[in-house]
């Protein structure tokens, strides 16, 4: 290795141009230019830079300089001045570099050459300004006419003549906004492999002799992503610090030569990014607001242990610059931005975001990062990044991530442009921007995503939009459902903790985890199935419909995954789901129906039969009875009549009674399903044997007769699904004959009936309006409909009686309305309608009695009193011969106060019916008496919640004895002995008690007494 004394001194005279025009503002920086050298062999007009003179030390050798020049890490930058380099995006300046073994000459100082060219500079200053302006406009117009950028491979030419550009040292260079790009593992990989850094200075054999130069390339700025990756390899461009910041770089002793580094160990860093970005030529410039400037990150030198040991440079020598890039890719530069694109992204304002808003955005970012992470895991790093960039939502929401560290956001003032109307247009515009350079993106997205820009702000502005939130949650849920847990036990514990939280979002997360466990780890749920079902069932009644809907769906997933293991939990879940079937929200009803269907399909059929019968058949809500009958019908079809009728006698009797109850329900759809199930049993031969073994009730015979006479509706279509057809009975002639289409308009019939048909049309509209009010969702509208029906019964009784079934199909549910005000008002109004309608109510009598009897157990005193008033009105106004079978058939299905009230009315009806038709009393009332005497205990109470019935049984037996006489004991002789004995004791004690009360209080023996405490045994 030679010494510095071996280097001969050389002196070169170089013209220096001083530009006196206006200089745009740039960041503040050091003012002293270090000596440098630029390749003089570059063609004029394409970036040939005139170097400043430099005196070479006597002891410097060209070989040392050449070895130091071979590595980019050896380049040293002193504090640059604020001049053309900062304005055009060039590095500040370079030291003089020795390239080859050519003789070196000393360069004169800039001060000695400034006076020689000052006179020429002043003369051409104004002329040059005008010429540059005209040529810049021409270049801008040519670029706008050629948006595609022209064919690749055409070299760029300066808009200033060669001599002028050489004198002014001005090379127009487009400089993009360099975003903060973090370090990546690829950079360290290149260092370890020892690869040469791309863009290094060529060897001496490639340069002309006698030249001291450094090539500055546009390759990094203009080549596309693929070529950039090939040219830069794994080089990571570090963040560019702001003013007054020191970049941590490998340092050396000031004044010494840069020591050669091993290949691949040089790390390129740079000063602050220029504030102007120029298009090709002297086109229009786009200024970047301060809020979008990249923030400094940790220097990549921290990853190099060897470099960390070196002392830091002083501030004046601390920042090397990017150099040694060739001009090869400059020929493939893209054309400048279009005018509308420049206007769109040029106008921006500063918006301050509060701390709470930033926290909400951070929460949103966490969800987005979780979604992207789930989608990126199965793929490699290269494929992962390309797919992330191709995703619409990930691309549009990239601008959210840098908001974590700052409280400001750059928001364009133009938000109604045409490119914001469609996401695809935005993506196409972003991808096809010709003047934007291709900058390699870090592979750690979206955590280190690019800053917010004009094309990524729609995601910010639509933050909290229901559409975005719903899509994101659905995608996240779908992504999680397909993936099993790495630790299922821990996932179950976390899910239960989330469900116990008071936050609805945590509850939703817990429910999604339960769905994942049910789909992928069903064996884990088996151990804690009861706890899981209990917690999930509790969320079905959540006031937030979103959580309730998700809980209902989760129950359906549990049924599908665990199947027969859910038998023990089916009853409680079925009650909860049936309760939700009466919800006003249709999507809740659909979800509950799907979960019930999943229960019927997966649990044991016998268990489904018991659950639906106990939870739905006896429910007060008609909608719940309807849906219970629907699913019960599906269960019966799967079991089959053969197996159902092969059970014990008690179970078969209970099943038949339940089906008869459904077949006589007030809701027409429930009646349809009930008759359908009875028809299934009737079609089997064992049903006849069942009828012979057990005495069929009057209700069963009536239902069977109706089925045989009318049959089941065709095509298994619900009556309500057929829609409300036009009432044909209203559109008839006066003589009852229907109107024929072939009848002439001038015929004698039609002329006489025009006024009548017009009045009938008004009646049809009136009935339609009445039906709409009775079935309205608002309780005030339903109360108004009940009032209109009462007025219509008073004013137009014939109209109501002619369409009684259609009217009462809408009115009967109001007698059991979920709203207490509507329920009580309907009962009170119906008590007033009964004397007006009288015998016309017989077709609807059974369904009305079922509904009214259920109200007798109401805890509301007003509803109970109104129901009792309806019973009394029916006994007084209706035909007792028709009323007796209906009331007697309901006693066995009643409990509580309803049994006492209905049995007390039976004792009254016996007195009026037996003289007219004794067979009716013997057939319907005597079985009720035997039932009471057979099941009553010694103290006169029935098992269950019915209470003490001694008083009503005594009145019933005395009423029967008064009208039947000794025939009552004759019928009792065929019953078990304890029944006969109990009846005799009851009659004797009643007669003695009545005589004693008549003697002591002066009350007639036949007066009604209730609440007697005498037991059934004799004294």
Swiss-Prot record:
List where the protein spans the membrane: none
SUPFAM superfamilies listed in its UniProt record: ARM repeat
SMART domains recorded: TOG (SM01349)
Q: Which GO terms describe its cellular component?
A: cilium; cytoplasmic microtubule
Q: Entry's Gene3D superfamilies?
A: Leucine-rich Repeat Variant
Stretches of Polar residues bias are at: 1007-1019
Ranges where the record places region Disordered: 28-54, 131-158, 249-311, 991-1019
- UniProt xrefs under Pfam families: CLASP_N (PF12348)
Q: Name one GO biological process term.
A: microtubule cytoskeleton organization
Q: One GO molecular-function annotation for this sequence?
A: microtubule binding
Query: What family is this?
Result: Belongs to the Crescerin family.
Protein known as:
TOG array regulator of axonemal microtubules protein 2
Higher taxonomy: Eukaryota, Metazoa, Chordata, Craniata, Vertebrata
């Amino acid at each position: 290795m030679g010494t510095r004394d071996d280097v001969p001194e050389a002196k070169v005279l170089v013209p220096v141009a001083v530009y006196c025009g206006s200089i745009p503002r740039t960041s503040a920086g050091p003012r002293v230019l270090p000596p440098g050298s630029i390749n003089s062999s570059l063609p004029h007009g394409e970036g040939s830079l005139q170097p400043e003179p430099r005196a070479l030390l006597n002891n410097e050798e060209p070989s040392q300089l050449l070895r130091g020049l071979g590595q980019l890490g050896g380049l040293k930058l002193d504090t640059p001045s604020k001049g053309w380099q900062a304005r055009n995006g060039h590095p500040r300046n370079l030291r003089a570099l020795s390239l080859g073994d050519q003789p070196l000459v000393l360069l004169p100082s800039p001060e000695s050459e400034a006076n020689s060219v000052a006179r020429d500079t002043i003369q051409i200053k104004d002329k040059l300004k005008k010429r540059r302006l005209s040529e810049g406009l021409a270049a801008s117009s040519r670029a706008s006419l050629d948006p595609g950028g022209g064919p690749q491979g055409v070299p760029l030419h300066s808009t200033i003549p060669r001599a002028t550009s050489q004198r002014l040292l001005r090379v127009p260079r487009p400089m993009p906004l360099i975003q903060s790009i973090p370090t990546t593992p690829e950079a360290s990989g290149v260092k370890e492999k020892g690869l040469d850094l791309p863009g290094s200075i060529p060897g001496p054999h490639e340069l002309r002799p006698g030249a001291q130069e450094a090539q500055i390339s546009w390759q990094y700025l203009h080549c596309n992503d693929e070529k950039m990756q090939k040219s830069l390899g794994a080089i990571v461009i570090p963040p560019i610090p702001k003013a007054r910041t020191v970049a941590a770089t490998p340092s050396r002793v000031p004044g010494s030569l840069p020591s050669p580094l091993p290949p691949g160990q040089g790390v390129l860093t740079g000063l602050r990014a220029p504030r102007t970005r120029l298009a090709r030529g002297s086109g229009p410039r786009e200024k970047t607001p301060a809020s979008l400037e990249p923030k400094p990150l940790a220097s990549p030198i921290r990853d190099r242990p060897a470099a960390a040991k070196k002392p830091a440079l002083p501030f004046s020598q601390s920042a090397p610059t990017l150099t040694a890039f060739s001009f090869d890719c400059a020929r493939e530069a893209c054309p400048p931005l279009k005018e509308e694109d420049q206007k769109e992204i040029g106008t921006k304002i500063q918006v301050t975001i509060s701390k709470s808003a930033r926290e909400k955005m951070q929460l949103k970012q966490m969800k987005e990062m979780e979604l992207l992470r789930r989608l990126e895991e199965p793929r490699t790093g290269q494929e992962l990044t390309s797919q992330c960039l191709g995703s619409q939502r990930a691309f549009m929401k990239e601008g959210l991530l840098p908001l974590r560290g700052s409280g400001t956001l750059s928001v364009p003032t133009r938000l109604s442009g045409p490119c914001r109307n469609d996401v695809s247009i935005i993506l196409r515009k972003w991808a096809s921007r010709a003047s934007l350079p291709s900058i390699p993106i870090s592979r750690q997205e979206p955590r280190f995503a690019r800053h917010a820009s004009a094309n990524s702000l729609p995601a910010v502005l639509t933050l909290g939009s229901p559409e975005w939130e719903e899509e994101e949650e659905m995608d996240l849920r779908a992504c999680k459902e397909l993936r099993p847990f790495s630790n299922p036990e821990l996932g179950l514990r976390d899910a239960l903790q989330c469900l116990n939280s008071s936050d609805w979002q945590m509850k939703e997360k817990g429910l999604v985890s339960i769905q994942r466990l049910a789909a992928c780890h069903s064996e884990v749920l088996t151990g804690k199935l009861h706890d899981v079902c209990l917690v999930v069932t509790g969320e079905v009644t959540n006031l937030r419909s979103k959580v309730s809907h998700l809980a209902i769906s989760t129950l359906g997933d549990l049924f599908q995954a665990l199947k027969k293991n859910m038998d023990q939990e089916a009853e409680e879940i079925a009650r909860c789901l049936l309760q939700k079937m009466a919800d006003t929200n249709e999507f809740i009803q659909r979800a509950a129906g799907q979960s019930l269907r999943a229960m019927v399909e997966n649990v044991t059929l016998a268990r489904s039969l018991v659950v639906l019968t106990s939870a739905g058949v006896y429910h007060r809500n008609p909608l719940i009875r309807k849906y219970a009958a629907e699913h019960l019908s599906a269960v019966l079809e799967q079991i089959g009549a053969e197996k159902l009728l092969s059970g014990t006698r008690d179970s078969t009797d209970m099943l038949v009674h339940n089906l008869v109850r459904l077949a006589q329900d007030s809701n027409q759809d429930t009646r349809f399903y009930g008759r359908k199930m009875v028809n299934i049993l009737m079609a089997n031969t064992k049903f006849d044997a069942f009828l012979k073994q057990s005495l069929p009730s009057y209700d069963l015979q009536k239902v069977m007769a109706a089925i045989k006479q009318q049959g089941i509706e065709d095509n298994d279509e619900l009556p309500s699904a057929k829609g409300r057809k036009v009432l044909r009975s209203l559109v008839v002639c006066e003589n009852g004959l229907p109107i024929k289409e072939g009848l002439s308009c001038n015929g004698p019939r039609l002329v006489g009936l025009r006024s009548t048909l017009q009045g009938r049309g008004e009646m049809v509209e009136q009935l339609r309006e009445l039906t709409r009010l009775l079935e309205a969702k608002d309780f005030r509208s339903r109360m108004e409909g009940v009032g209109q029906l009462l007025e219509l019964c008073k004013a137009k009784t014939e109209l109501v009686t002619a369409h009684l079934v259609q009217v009462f199909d809408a009115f009967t549910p109001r007698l059991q309305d979920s709203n207490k005000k509507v329920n009580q008002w309907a009962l009170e109004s119906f008590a007033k309608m009964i004397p007006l309608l009288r015998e016309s109510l017989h077709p609807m009598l059974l369904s009305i009695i079922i509904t009214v009897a259920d109200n007798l157990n109401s805890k509301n005193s007003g509803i109970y009193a109104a129901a009792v008033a309806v019973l009394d009105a029916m006994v007084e106004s209706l035909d007792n011969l028709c009323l007796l079978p209906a009331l007697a058939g309901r006693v066995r299905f009643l409990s509580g106060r309803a049994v006492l009230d209905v049995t007390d009315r039976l004792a009254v009806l016996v007195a009026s019916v037996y003289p007219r038709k004794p067979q009716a009393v013997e057939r319907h009332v005597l079985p009720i008496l035997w039932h009471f005497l057979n099941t009553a205990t010694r103290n006169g109470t029935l098992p269950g919640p019915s209470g003490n019935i001694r008083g009503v049984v005594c009145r019933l037996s005395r009423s029967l004895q008064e009208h039947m006489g000794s025939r009552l004991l004759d019928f009792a002789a065929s019953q078990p002995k304890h029944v006969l004995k109990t009846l005799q004791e009851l009659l004797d004690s009643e007669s003695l008690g009545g005589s004693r009360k008549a003697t002591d209080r002066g009350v007639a023996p036949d007066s009604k007494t209730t609440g007697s405490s005498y037991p059934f045994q004799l004294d």
